[in-house]
Structures are given as C-alpha cells and as structure tokens.
Amino acid sequence: MDKIKKNDETDCVAVYGARVHNLKNIDAFIPHDKLTVITGLSGSGKSSLAFDTVYAEGQRRYIETFSSYARNMLGALERPDVDKITGLCPVISIEQKTVNKNPRSTIGTITEVYDFLRLLFARIGEAVSYKSGKPMIKYTEEQILELILGKFDNQKVLILSPLVNNRKGHYKELFEQLRRKGYLNVRVDGELQEIVVGMRLDRYKNHNIELVVDKLKVSGKDSQRLKETIAVAMKQGDGVIQVFDVEKGEGFFYSKSLMDPITGLSYREPAPHNFSFNSMQGACPKCKGLGSVNLIDVDKIIPDKSKTIYSGGILPLGSYSNNFIFSQIAGICEKEGYSLKTPIKDLSEKALDEILNGTDEALVNPAGIGRGYQPTYDGIVKYIEMQQNDEVSSKAQKWAGQFYTPTVCPVCHGARLNREALHYFIDGKNIDELANMELSDLKEWVDTVEQKLGKQQQVVAKEILKEIRSRLHFLNDVGLDYLSLSRSSMSLSGGESQRIRLATQIGSQLVNVLYILDEPSIGLHQRDNDRLIHSLKELRDLGNTVVVVEHDKDMMLESDYVIDIGPKAGRKGGKVVFAGTPEEMLKSGTLTAGYLNGSLKIEVPAKRRKGNGKKLTLRGCSGNNLKDVDLTLPLGALICVTGVSGSGKSTIINETLQPILSQKFYRSLKEPLPYKAIKGIENIDKVVSVDQAPIGKSPRSNPATYTNVFANIRNLFVELPEAKIRGYKPGRFSFNMSGGRCDVCKGNGYRSIEMNFLPNVLVPCEACHGQRYNRETLEVRFKGKSIADVLDMTINQAVEFFENMPSILSKIKVLQDVGLGYIKLGQPSSTLSGGESQRVKLATELSKKDTGKTLFILDEPTTGLHFEDIRILMGVLNKLVDRGNTVLVIEHNLDVIKCADYIVDMGPEGGKNGGKIIAVGTPEEICESKDSITGKFLRKELMNL
C-alpha cells in the first residue's frame, strides 16, 4: 500500500477516509491497469469499499454531468461517506444478478450475437418454400418476358393476376371494380367466369380469384404486347403473375419478389426484423414470439380420476353443492347414463368431453328451471378461460392460472419465429437451429461456414461473421460454451449472468475503464477457473483496471494486487489488514493468508457417515440434457452434487427432485421436468429448499421479522412493568402498525422530500430521528435499551444482551452460528446479499424443531463466503446431519466437497456432452475415478492435507 502511495497518485485509484457502513475511516489504493482482488471475511467491508464507495462515487460523478431533468428521471445518488477519491476513471459494475426478467430476453439478444445472425440471414440467407421445399426465385420483368417466350413459345396462355388467395367473402365490390375498369373475365376457384353486374360468391367459403389480364398465343413477333401485358398484370397482382397453359391446364408463377414458381407462395424481401421474434414481421403468430403458450391442463382440473364429481373430483368446482353448474353437469351425466357419484375414470369419453368443453344439446331440466327453458352448457374449460379476462379481478385470474400449464407452441414448436423466417438457410441451417446450438458448436460452425459460401456471399458476410466470431470467442473463454443463444436470461444463474456481461464487456474493447466484479467464479467448476482468470487478464491487458471482490484461492494468487479487509466481520472489521502482491500476502499473518499458505485449513472429517440405511431413488430423469438418469441418495448423510458447469446438477436437483417433493409435501404448482418414478419418498417428511432469493420484498423485512424472533422480543417488552402500566399490547412495538410507530414517517425511519426538478431526497425522520417509533414507545426499556436500540444491535451484541432469555436466544444464536454475527437484527432485507439471505433462511430452519427426517437442499451455499465462513458453515450443516436429517448441496467449492459423506459427480462435460452421472461414492472413491474431472482436482486437495 505504501509503495503505491509514495508513487504518483495518478497511477492508482486513491481512496481517503472511507467510512461507508462498517469501514473505519480507511485509506485504500487500487493500482491502475492491474488485476486487484479485494478479499476478507463475509461482512468485513469488501463490498462497502468496492461497490458502495468506489463504484457509487464513479456513478455519482457521471450522473452529475447530466441536466437536472435527466438527474431527476434517474433518481437520487447519494455521495458516499468518504473524504476524497482521486484517480477515478469511468466505472462499470458487473454484479451477480439475473440479467433480465423479460421472457423475450435471451443470451443471443443480450450479447447481440443474435442481432448479427439476423443481419447475416437477411443478407445471404437462401429462401426455400415451406409448401414445396423448392428454392424461392425472383425475377425482373425482362427476365420474366424471356422465360415466358422460351417456355410457352407458340402456345395459348392466360396471363393472370392473383387477387384473392384462399379467403372467405362474396367479393361483390371487387368484381364491380374490375368490371368498371373494363376487364371481362376472372378465374374463380379454377373456373373461367365472365364478370357480370351483381356478381357475388358464397361468402362462407374460401375462394381463389385470378384476374384474366390477357389471352394470347406466345410468339417472339408479338413480344411487345406480351411485355405490356406482363407490366399490367404485375401491377394488378401486386408484383406477382401467373401464366396458365390452356392446353396442359398448368399454371406457373412469376414474381419480382421471392416466389415459389410451383405454388405461387411469395415471401417479403428479407430484412433483419423478419428474423426477430420481438417483431411482428418475424414472430410466430400463435405465441407472439415467446415460444410457448399457456394451455389448460386437464390433469390439473381432474388430478385424481378415481374420485367422483360429487366428492370433488373436478378441482375447480370442489365438492357437491346445490347450485346451477352442478345441476347442469348432473343433466349431462343423466343423459349419458351416469350420475355425479360415478367415478370419473368410468365416465365415457363423450361424457367427460361434454363436462369439460360443453355441449349445445339441450340438457335435462335442472332443478329450479321452468319447463319452457332448456339451457345449454359451456363447460369447465370455458369457465376457467373466462377468468383470465382482463375485466375480472387479479385474484380470480390467479385462481384460474393454477389450471394452466406452459406448453411448447404447437405452431412454431418453440422456435419463436414464423414459417417464413424459418425457411431461410445458410449451409443447410436456419436461424433457429443455429440459436439452439451450444456456443462451442456454433463457434465451430461460424469458423468454417465462410469457406462454403459463394464469392459474393463471402464479401457480404465477412464483417458480420467477424463480429459474431469475436463475441463467441469471449463467451467460450468465460466458461459458457455449454449454453445456447436461445437460452432465456430468466433461467440463468447469477454467476452465468455475470460472466455473460463480462464477455460482452471484453468484446466491446473499451479502454481506460475501471471494472468492478462481484465473485465472478460463482457457479464455475475448478476446471473452468483458469479460463475465467485468463479473460480477466485479457480485460486488464486492453488497458483497464479490474477489481474483483473474490474468495477464490486461484484468483488471489493470479492477481497483481490483493487488498484484505478485516480482521473480522461487522464492527470488528472495516480495516485494511493487508495490501500488496500475492507473494507478499502469503507471508503476512492475516486470516486469509493462513488459508492461502496452508497454515490454516478446513479439516476433512475423520470418518465418513454411511447414512441411516434408507434411500431416496429417482429414476429416468430426462429433462434438459439429462440422459435418462437414475439418482440414488443415501439418507442421513451430507451429499454433494458436483460436476462442470452445465453438466445437469441444477436440472436433476432443483428442477426435477425438488419440485416432485414440493408437490408431495406442499401441493406446489411448479411442474418437475420429465422423470419415470421416485421411490423412498416415505423416508422423509419434509423438504426445505434454501435458495439465495431475498428474504422479503420490502425494506421493512429484516432478519428479526423473517426468523420471527421479533415476535418474541415484542412479547418481552409487553411484559415489562412500564408497558403493563400503560396497557401496551404487542402491536404497540411493531413499526408496521399505527399506535407505537412514528406517525410522521409511518415506521420507515426516513422521509422522502420532493425537490421538484431535482431528485427526491431521503432524510432521517425529524420526529423519531430514524428510530421508527414514537417517543412514548421508546420510553419502555429493557436493560436500558428501547425496542429501536434492540433492532440496531448486531447479532453478536444481541446474543450477549439476551443470554438469559432462552426463547429469544435460541433463534438469534443460530444466526450467529451460520456466520451472520455482524449483521443487525433490524437490517433491511434489501441490503442483504444473496449469500446472507440464504444463511438467514438456513438459520430460520435450524431454529425450528425437526423430526430428523428432513431433506435440506442448498444451491452453492458458499457464495460470498470466506474460507473461515465456510468452516463455520460446515459445522452448521454437520449439525443438521447429526440430528438425522439429509443435507443435499450443489457445490463447486473443494473445501465443501472434501467434507461430504457422499458425492454424485455429473458430466463428463457441460451441455449435450453432459447429463450423465459419472461417479458416486465418498470423496476418496471419486478421486479414483478416471472419468471424473472433479476427482482430478479433489485428488490434489486431499493429497495436500
């Protein structure tokens, strides 16, 4: 640190007096044009320095260059609590969050690769007729003249202009217009007819109408007449004519636009928007470019066909009640020879179809209906569809939504595009086939396709292919080769989203930029880590400063500079305990250095648990890239599911097993991916999925409210003498209810001040000074602390404060046990990271009583965790297993994998080359597998112990 400080400050980003969150008035120096890693315990202040100080100041300075109107539209950006920052260049933050919640957003649209593919197909794509499969052809009028003279020489022909193609209508007005223009004949549905006054067709039938422009014998001597006829026919037929050979009875189409000469099918002139599923010109007309449609699922309407209608077999209706709809259904059943008490499985196909889809037949008079009125019945399906109307309440729409299932669009089969767009080809591939290729295969296709193009096509495609090739190179380099351009951005993990943005930034070739990344190694297998580090160095070598908030050992050792924040978390952190090169770091005495140089380590358990002898078996999993996989999990053990990125870990656990169990135990609506059978489900009584989603959507949500310890704390305050004298109830101590909360800020602790043309400013409430409660409520104190003081305590402080209160201590202590001692009891959920939110949820489950038969599912719980935090987490997970539960973890971190009792390793690669279980067993057994990539890295880890 001193070395940089002594040099010219223009060589670094110099931060002086940073006090954001828990930072202790620190100075930090980040060298320009270097790869710097900021590390430290969870909650030590890494993100406070990188994102909340450096990035926030960079954004603030950028926004200040805008007009006051623009600043108001963008919202307020507070100045971070720092004395000064010098040497700051433009800042770009690449965080771990899903790129886009829009179902139309894909990897292709985010990275712009799909945009270049659209341009490529619009310029050199070869059109093929979707009717005949023949290449589409377009001509000039001169070429059409030459073709007709050559093909129909000395033959009698009709020159026709197609006007109506397979459409309903009487066309009375059309015939009258043609008659007034002087035309005598038309061909209607293949028959030649004279145009007469009042001529009309059957309006309910589909018709084909062609105008007879001329009837002549083709001859080179009369080419001028033919040329003029072609010009008139082209004008009347909107650029299309048909030449009908009278003797042979055959017609041939000619067009100035792309046309099928056999069927007359015409395509628009191709443009990039014709290949976009976000454009009306390119999108599938059925699904509007989404690739899927919501259809009513009969299995959701009738989940159990062994039940009767009377006993509630039709879920939307429930059990029998004496109402009109049940009397109508009773009428259908009686008509078909059944009753409401007949099991649904015994009803005829016709009866069930009428119950679901309705009938126009008159029903037996239901009770209460006069004999003069015999109502018809619309059906259950129609009733549910009516509830999806915008005019009904959102509650009714939500109710109806449970009976729908997203289904692949029956028209485009998930391709999102219309038929025309899907019938342009380059080297035998349409744009959807390319979008569905894995990025590694697409890169190979792009690298070789140029050689297969014609000379003119090569000239046109050269620059477009260069842009595509560049972007695919970077996407493959950051370990995303198993994904495809068609992959929805909504389905990406935080780590995948971050690496996509990283690849996009590298491809943009910007220089003199400060990039700040938040744990880019998340979700990445050890094998792919080298490629990620190489990409970051590539970004640095372009002339950029790269700052990475990271815990990965390889990333630290490969960096140019390391800043270690500590020594502990929360109030005991916030200091720069080390700054220097990785080599200097290894010799320092910090906690991080101890884990890097091997003096500290996470110990491997002396003995592996074998489980309780019971198993959970999942057979025939075939979702996404899974190859008919059978999964067997020993219960009562710590199980790790491992494998390279894209090998199928999340597919088999999060998208197959977890939804199956959630449906069984909680009637979840989420459908699992395809599987054949599950056995052993009776050996567990609960499934708990601990993910990284926020613990609440409102800033009012916090660890105290989520764990429900706040209810215990409020009950404690109610029992205090002062509260009893005043007659206070628990609601008095809630900041969500009127009475005890501050009436000025409504319990928020701050007020929003409108600044007209400037952004609104958030200021602490002048009445409660940010404490959320009114003066009377704050007068009730326990051990000298008010309810607001308690919420402002860290978990570590609260554990000491409530040490003699078992009901409160038990819930707070588990938060401390999972490494969250540094966060505040009342800390808004919006300020918690994904890893912190996950551990709050884990602590909440730990505080509950269990039967010892619970299955816990955790997806990368080490996200955001330092080596020391992982050691603490492993202690918590082992406690769960020791109580008889099963813990199932999807993880890449070798410190967790080496401590597992049982490993399921998937692979061998990602994407189409994955989807298999490569090896199962203890870590030692995985090390012996020749096919396991995880085993190769695990072997090194276990050998170093």
Residue positions per predicted region:
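Conserved phosphate-binding elements of NTP-dependent enzyme cores
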Residues: 1-945
